[in-house]
Amino acid sequence: FLSEPGNAYKQCHKKGGHCFPKEKICIPPSSDFGKMDCRWRWKCCKKRSGK
């Protein structure tokens, strides 16, 4: 199964997040979703929205 370019991390993106290196701290009020479907030693962080 090959995903389309840019859609490699569907689970993370569905939650509105992006993959970051594991060392990055997700600063509140961002959410840290953990690894999700990001690559090894990365994690999914959702940056706070402007709403």
Curated annotation (Swiss-Prot):
GO terms for cellular component: extracellular region. One of its GO terms (biological process) is envenomation resulting in occlusion of the pore of voltage-gated potassium channel in another organism. It holds the Pfam family Myotoxins. Expressed by the venom gland. It comes from the Eukaryota. Its main location: secreted. One of its GO terms (molecular function) is potassium channel regulator activity. The keyword Disulfide bond applies. Disulfide bonds join 12-44, 19-38, 26-45. Keywords: Antimicrobial, Disulfide bond, Ion channel impairing toxin, Myotoxin, Neurotoxin, Potassium channel impairing toxin, Secreted, Signal, Toxin, Voltage-gated potassium channel impairing toxin. It is found in: Secreted. Residues 1-8 form the signal peptide. Monomer. Belongs to the crotamine-myotoxin family. Cationic peptide that possesses multiple functions. It acts as a cell-penetrating peptide (CPP), and as a potent voltage-gated potassium channel (Kv) inhibitor. It exhibits antimicrobial activities, hind limb paralysis, and severe muscle necrosis by a non-enzymatic mechanism. This is Myotoxin-4.
